[in-house]
């Protein structure tokens, strides 16, 4: 049982990006204005956006490095401005 769990975890990391990274960018209805990064599945890059502070989703990272690490982005190109 443990073997199967480990196998599926490794397969998920090896053959696809984190499912949270496929979620759409959500600014949210609040007006906080926090600089965050999200994975854009169309451009296959982590991009900067302004987060309102509430009702976001898991595709919301404090740093570019965190976004790239979680979402498996290999290139270190400058983030796209939105």
Swiss-Prot record:
UniProt KW keywords: Disulfide bond, Ion channel impairing toxin, Nematocyst, Potassium channel impairing toxin, Protease inhibitor, Secreted, Serine protease inhibitor, Signal, Toxin, Voltage-gated potassium channel impairing toxin
Family matches, as PANTHER family: BPTI_KUNITZ INHIBITOR DOMAIN-CONTAINING PROTEIN (PTHR10083:SF374), KUNITZ-TYPE PROTEASE INHIBITOR-RELATED (PTHR10083)
Span of domain BPTI/Kunitz inhibitor: 21-71
Paired cysteines (S-S): 21-71, 30-54, 46-67
Keyword presence, Ion transport: no
Origin species: Anemonia viridis
Cited PROSITE patterns: BPTI_KUNITZ_1 (PS00280), BPTI_KUNITZ_2 (PS50279)
Sequence similarity: Belongs to the venom Kunitz-type family. Sea anemone type 2 potassium channel toxin subfamily.
Keyword Iron annotated: no
GO cellular component: extracellular region; nematocyst
The protein's name in its UniProt record: U-actitoxin-Avd3m
Function: Serine protease inhibitor that inhibits both tissue and plasma kallikreins. Has hemolytic activity. Inhibits voltage-gated potassium channels (Kv).
Gene Ontology molecular function, alphabetical: potassium channel regulator activity; serine-type endopeptidase inhibitor activity; toxin activity
SMART domains: KU
Gene3D superfamilies attached to this UniProt entry: Pancreatic trypsin inhibitor Kunitz domain
Subcellular location: Secreted; Nematocyst
Entry-linked InterPro entries: Kunitz_BPTI, Kunitz_BPTI_sf, Prtase_inh_Kunz-CS, TFPI/VKTCI-like
Cleaved propeptide residues: 76-82
Extent of the signal sequence: 1-16
Residues with site note (Reactive bond): 31-32
